[in-house]
UniProtKB/Swiss-Prot annotation:
Pfam families, sorted: BacA
Protein name per Swiss-Prot or TrEMBL: Undecaprenyl-diphosphatase
Signal peptide segment: none
UniProt-listed InterPro entries: UppP
Keywords assigned by UniProt, alphabetized: Antibiotic resistance, Cell inner membrane, Cell membrane, Cell shape, Cell wall biogenesis/degradation, Hydrolase, Membrane, Peptidoglycan synthesis, Transmembrane, Transmembrane helix
UniProt keyword Endoplasmic reticulum, yes or no: no
Transmembrane regions: 40-59, 87-107, 116-136, 160-180, 188-208, 220-240, 247-267
Length: 269
């Protein structure tokens, strides 16, 4: 992989892993559209690490607070929504961890080579996001999340294995349907994604440690980490500011246009 491809794909990963537009769809469709070779698992590691760095840096205070609250609850401190939230996040990650470990490879094998289905998922789940943003009451706050809410959002996260769905998109959609505000939905979505992204990164780092970095891949790998981290950090900040003032319809329209554009490209080939 050359440095230009690494930069473009790093930027795409950083932006689309966080925004509700599906990083997996973009990382499959962009190389397919331009005829680029597949990036491979080494570069996959770089992209996941970059995203993890961005999320960990942006939510460093939230993470520290979650750890303190979890320990407080374990050591006899007063039980509250704050001390329970870390455990709700962990519980919400369990379904996606199990499904991901079991089905990630067969799902990727089925859908990676089918851009039309990916485009259909972009459109279909974009419409679902629009419906949630329109019908959701948007009243509930972070301190009102309970185990049932966390598990329902966590179950929805399992659908993110399908390229074109979007991890942040489907969890924000589920949270909106459950009545949470846009900001709470987005923030909880990111906190819920941290253990999953970290787990995926660690699994792929393990593969990298066992097999080593292929010759000539170190520079693109480092570029991928850095670029995806920078763009990921910026896009988290951007999304959290946007949802405080505006609807999620700009992302819905983007998904519809991107999906329709891919379908038109396929049918005109």
């Amino acid at each position: 992989m050359n440095p230009l491809h690494a930069t473009v794909l790093g930027a795409i990963q950083g932006l689309t892993e966080v925004l509700p537009v599906s990083s997996s769809a973009h990382l499959i469709l962009i190389p397919w559209l331009f005829g680029w070779p597949e990036s491979g698992i080494t570069f996959d590691v770089a992209l996941h690490l970059g995203t993890l760095i961005a999320l960990a840096l942006y939510f460093r205070r939230d993470i520290a607070e979650l750890v303190v609250n979890a320990l407080s609850g374990l050591t006899g401190g007063a039980h509250s929504s704050a001390t329970r939230l870390p455990w709700y996040i962990i519980a919400g990650c369990v379904p996606a961890a199990i499904v991901g470990k079991t089905l990630e490879e067969p799902i990727e094998a089925i859908f990676r080579a089918n851009p039309a289905i990916i485009a259909a998922f972009l459109i279909g789940f974009g419409l679902l996001l629009a419906l949630a943003d329109t019908l959701g009451s948007k009243k509930s706050r972070m301190d009102q999340i309970d185990l049932k809410n966390a598990m329902m959002i966590g179950l929805a996260q399992c659908l993110a294995l399908l390229p074109g769905v979007s991890r942040s998109g489907i969890t924000i959609t589920a949270a909106l349907f459950l009545g949470f505000s846009r900001e709470t939905a987005a923030r909880f979505s990111f906190l819920l994604s941290l253990p999953i992204v970290a787990g995926a990164a660690l699994l792929k780092v393990g593969h990298l440690v066992r097999h080593g970095v292929p010759e000539g891949e170190l520079q693109p790998l480092l570029i991928g980490v850095g670029v995806s981290a920078v763009f990921g950090y910026v896009s988290v900040a951007l999304l959290l500011k946007l949802v405080q003032r505006y609807s999620l319809y700009p992302f819905v329209w983007y998904r519809l246009l991107a999906g329709a554009g891919v379908l038109l490209f396929i049918f005109n080939q």
